[in-house]
C-alpha cells in the first residue's frame, strides 16, 4: 500500500463479542473542539450527510470554493454514513473504509476519543520526527515514550527528533505510548522502519520463497504431533518454525538470493482429519488453512517465542517475512464459529449442484466443515481485521498473503489494507499485501482474457492489495510453453508482455511456475510419464525424474521467471527440482543437499546463481521488459533500468548464434560467448548479459 490515508479512526470495543482492540491512526478530528470533520469536493447544488449516529437527521454541508464541510460532535465509535449529492446517495470518495448497516453498504467512519492524545510521525533525511498531538484539553506529555530516550524534544513544536544513523542496521519497530499531564492515555503509535542498506528495499526487489512449514525442516522433534490417521501424504510430517530459523541462520536463503519468506498460516489448526474434496480420503490440517484459534501459534509448529526468534533471525539476514492470512473461512471447531455462528454464511457447498463457484463465491462453503465468514457482519469483519493487525504487530511481520480473496466481499481487502496502512505505514515503510484470486487463461485472444485480468485487478489498488499471484500468466505459459511445449516462445513473449500492461499500474504482481496448489513442475516436465496429476498412493505417484531434459526445462522456466518483472515466487524444493503430483503429493518433505542427485545439485547451483544475480541487479529487479528478438525456440529480451540494462536469452532449441551484441557486453550467467557483435548460444540454455559492462582500456 502506497498512500497514507487520513480517515477518522476508531479504538473499537464490540460488546457482542469481546474484541482485543488494536487502535488505528490518523483520525480527522479537530482537536480544538473535538469534532469530526466530513468533507467532499466538487460542483453541486446541495451536499448533505446522513449517518448511523442518527439516520433520521440529515446534515447540510457548508460550501467554500467547491469544498464542502460539516463538523459533528460524535462519541467514540464506528458509524456508517453516506453523502447525498443533489439527491443521490454516494460513498465518501476520500474514505475507502466500508461496512454494512441493515444490509446496505456504506462508508464507515471510525471516531476516536478526542480527549486522548495522538502521535504523528515522519522519516526525513535519516531523522525520525515524532509529533505529539494533545487531546482536547491541550495537556502536554508526561515524560518521554520508550524508544525516544535519546531523541531531542522541542516543546514549541511538540516534537521528538531521533537521528536514526545512531541505530544499528536492520529493522526497528517503536511502539510509542504515553500519558498526558492530566492522566489521559494516548493512543499508541507504531513506527516500523529499516536502517541501513535495507531501507532502500522495494517490493519489486523481492524474490519470495514459499514455505509450507510442516513440510520444510523438522528443527524440534519434541513438538511433533501424533498421527491422525490421514491418508498417505496428507498427515503432519514434523516441519516447524525452528527448522525455518535454522535454515535462515545457515545462509541457505542468502545463497538463493531470497529476501522474502512467505510461510503458511501459523494459527492453531484443527485436530484429527477431514474428508478431502474427492469424498474418499482423510486429510489433516498440516497445511494451516483450517484455523480453530485466532491468536495462537499451532504447538505442532512451535511457540510464539520461537516465531519471534525466527522473524528476528530473518530480519538480521535482510529477509522480510510474510504471513498467510485466511479471511474466507474457519474450521467448524474455531472459537468464533462456536461462540458466534451468526458471523457466518449458511450457504451451499461450493461446486455442488445449484452451487456454482462463481455465482455463490461469497456465501458457499469450501467443505461442510469450513464455515464461510460473512464480511457483511460488522462484528465479524472488524474482528478478523483486528486479528490480522495483531499477528503483524505481535511478531513484527512485514506483509501478508491473503487467501481466497474473491470469495469474500470487496470490503475485506480494502478495509484490511486501510487498517494496515494506518497502523504500520506511519513513516512510509511499505507492508506488502499479496492476494490469491484464482483465475485462468481463456485462449490466445486478449479479449477472451479480459474477464480474468479484470477480476484480479478488482482487488488491487492504492486502497487495496498491492498485487496478486499472476494466475493468467501461469496458465498461459507454464504448461503450454515449458512443460508440454505446445506453444512457442512467441507465445511466451506475448503473455509476458501482457502482464506488464493489463494490471493496475504500480501493482507488484507475483509470477510463479510452482505452488502448493499445482503438481510440481519437475513432474509435469518429465516427458513420457502420465502420473503428474495423480494425488494418492493407490493411483501411482510420480517418481524422481531421470533425464537431463526435465531439469533443463525447469531451468528454462526459472530462468524466465527470475529475469522478468514482478516479485517472483520460488516454491520450496523447486530450487533442486523436487517432484510430486497433485495436492498433497506436491508437498513432500523438503530434502537437504545430502539427498540430492547430481542433476538436482546442478539445478540448485543454476537457480541460486540466477537468484543471486537478480538480487544484485537493479535492472532484473526494477527494469522494464522489452522484446529484442523472438522466434519459436529462441527469445531475447531486455530488462532496462536507467542505471543498467540486462539482456536475457532463452534457448530451448539447438545451438545458434545471434548478431546483436557488443564487445563491451558481458555474460553474467550461462556459457554463451561473445565475439565482436556475435553471441554463440548453447543448446537448451539460459543466458544473462549485462550491456556495456566492460570498460574499455585507456588509450
Where are these regions (language model features)?
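Aromatic-rich carbohydrate-binding modules that target alpha-glucans
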Residues: 28-78, 84-112, 143-156
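Bacterial N-terminal signal peptides
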Residues: 8-18
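Short, solvent-exposed loop/turn segments at the edges of extracellular beta-sandwich modules
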Residues: 88, 179-184
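Surface-exposed, short loops/turns at beta-strand junctions within beta-sandwich domains
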Residues: 74-78, 164-171
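Substrate-binding/active-site clefts of carbohydrate-active enzymes
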Residues: 202, 216-395, 412-426, 432-437, ...
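C-terminal beta-strand-rich structural cap/linker in extracellular carbohydrate-active enzymes
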Residues: 80-81, 676-698
Amino acid at each position: 500500500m502506497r498512500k497514507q490515508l487520513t480517515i477518522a479512526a476508531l479504538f473499537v470495543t464490540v460488546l457482542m463479542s469481546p474484541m482485543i482492540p488494536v487502535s488505528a491512526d490518523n483520525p480527522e478530528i479537530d482537536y480544538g473542539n473535538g469534532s469530526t470533520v466530513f468533507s467532499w469536493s466538487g460542483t453541486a447544488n446541495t451536499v448533505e450527510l446522513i449517518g448511523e449516529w442518527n439516520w433520521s437527521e440529515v446534515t447540510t454541508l457548508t460550501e467554500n470554493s467547491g469544498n464542502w464541510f460539516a463538523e459533528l460532535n460524535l462519541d467514540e465509535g464506528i458509524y456508517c454514513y453516506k453523502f447525498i449529492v443533489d439527491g443521490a446517495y454516494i460513498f465518501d470518495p476520500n474514505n475507502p473504509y466500508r461496512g454494512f448497516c441493515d444490509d446496505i453498504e456504506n462508508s464507515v467512519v471510525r471516531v476516536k476519543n478526542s480527549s486522548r492524545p495522538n502521535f504523528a510521525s515522519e522519516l526525513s533525511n535519516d531523522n525520525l520526527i515524532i509529533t505529539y498531538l494533545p487531546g482536547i484539553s491541550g495537556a502536554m506529555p508526561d515524560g518521554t515514550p520508550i524508544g525516544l530516550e535519546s531523541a531531542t524534544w522541542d516543546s514549541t513544536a511538540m516534537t521528538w527528533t531521533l537521528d536514526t544513523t545512531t541505530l544499528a542496521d536492520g529493522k526497528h519497530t517503536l511502539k510509542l505510548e504515553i500519558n498526558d499531564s492530566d492522566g489521559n492515555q494516548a493512543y499508541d503509535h507504531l513506527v516500523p522502519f529499516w536502517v541501513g542498506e535495507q531501507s532502500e528495499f522495494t517490493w519489486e526487489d523481492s524474490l519470495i520463497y514459499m514455505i509450507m512449514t510442516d513440510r520444510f525442516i523438522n528443527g524440534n522433534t519434541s513438538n511433533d504431533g501424533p498421527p491422525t490417521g490421514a491418508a498417505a501424504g496428507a498427515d503432519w510430517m514434523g516441519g516447524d518454525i525452528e527448522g525455518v530459523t535454522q535454515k535462515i541462520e545457515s545462509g541457505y536463503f542468502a545463497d538463493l538470493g531470497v529476501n522474502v519468506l512467505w510461510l503458511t498460516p501459523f494459527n492453531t489448526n484443527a485436530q484429527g482429519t477431514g474428508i478431502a474434496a474427492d469424498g474418499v480420503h482423510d486429510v489433516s490440517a498440516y497445511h494451516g488453512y483450517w484455523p480453530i484459534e485466532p491468536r495462537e501459534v499451532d504447538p505442532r509448529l512451535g511457540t510464539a517465542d520461537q516465531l519471534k526468534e525466527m522473524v528476528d533471525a530473518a530480519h538480521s539476514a535482510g529477509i522480510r517475512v510474510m504471513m498467510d492470512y485466511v479471511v474466507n473461512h474457519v474450521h467448524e471447531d474455531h472459537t468464533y464459529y462456536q461462540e458466534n455462528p451468526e458471523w457466518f454464511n449458511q450457504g451451499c457447498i461450493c461446486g455442488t449442484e445449484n452451487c456454482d463457484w462463481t455465482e455463490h463465491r461469497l456465501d458457499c462453503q469450501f467443505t461442510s466443515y469450513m464455515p464461510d465468514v460473512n464480511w457483511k457482519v460488522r462484528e465479524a469483519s472488524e474482528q478478523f481485521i483486528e486479528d490480522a493487525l495483531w499477528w503483524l504487530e505481535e511478531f513484527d511481520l512485514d506483509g501478508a498473503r491473503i487467501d481466497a480473496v474473491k470469495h469474500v466481499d470487496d470490503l475485506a481487502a480494502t478495509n484490511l489494507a486501510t487498517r494496515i496502512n494506518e497502523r504500520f505505514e506511519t513513516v512510509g515503510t511499505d507492508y506488502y499485501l499479496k492476494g490469491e484470486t484464482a483465475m485462468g487463461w481463456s485462449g490466445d485472444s486478449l479479449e477472451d482474457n479480459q474477464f480474468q485480468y479484470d477480476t484480479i485487478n478488482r482487488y488491487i489498488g492504492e486502497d487495496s492489495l498491492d498485487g496478486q499471484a499472476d494466475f493468467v500468466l501461469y496458465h498461459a505459459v507454464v504448461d503450454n510453453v515449458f512443460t508440454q511445449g505446445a506453444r512457442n516462445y512467441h507465445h511466451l513473449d506475448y503473455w509476458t508482455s501482457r502482464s506488464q500492461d493489463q494490471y493496475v499500474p504500480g501493482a507488484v504482481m507475483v509470477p510463479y511456475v510452482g505452488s502448493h496448489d499445482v503438481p510440481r513442475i519437475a513432474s509435469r516436465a518429465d516427458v513420457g510419464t502420465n502420473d503428474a496429476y495423480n494425488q494418492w498412493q493407490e493411483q501411482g505417484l510420480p517418481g524422481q525424474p531421470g533425464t537431463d531434459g526435465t531439469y533443463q526445462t525447469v531451468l528454462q522456466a526459472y530462468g524466465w521467471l527470475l529475469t522478468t518483472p514482478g516479485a517472483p515466487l520460488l516454491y520450496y524444493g523447486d530450487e533442486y527440482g523436487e517432484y510430486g503430483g497433485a495436492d498433497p503429493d506436491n508437498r513432500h518433505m523438503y530434502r537437504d543437499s545430502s539427498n540430492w542427485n547430481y542433476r538436482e545439485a546442478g539445478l540448485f547451483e543454476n537457480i541460486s546463481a540466477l537468484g543471486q544475480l537478480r538480487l544484485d541487479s537493479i535492472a532484473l529487479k526494477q527494469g522494464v521488459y522489452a522484446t529484442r528478438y523472438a522466434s519459436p525456440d529462441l527469445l531475447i529480451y531486455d530488462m532496462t533500468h536507467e542505471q543498467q540494462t540486462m539482456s536475457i536469452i532463452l534457448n530451448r532449441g539447438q545451438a545458434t548464434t545471434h548478431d546483436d551484441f557488443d564487445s563491451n557486453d558481458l555474460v553474467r550467467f550461462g556459457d554463451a560467448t561473445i565475439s565482436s557483435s556475435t553471441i554463440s548460444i548453447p543448446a537448451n540454455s539460459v543466458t544473462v548479459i549485462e550491456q556495456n559492462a566492460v570498460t574499455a582500456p585507456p588509450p
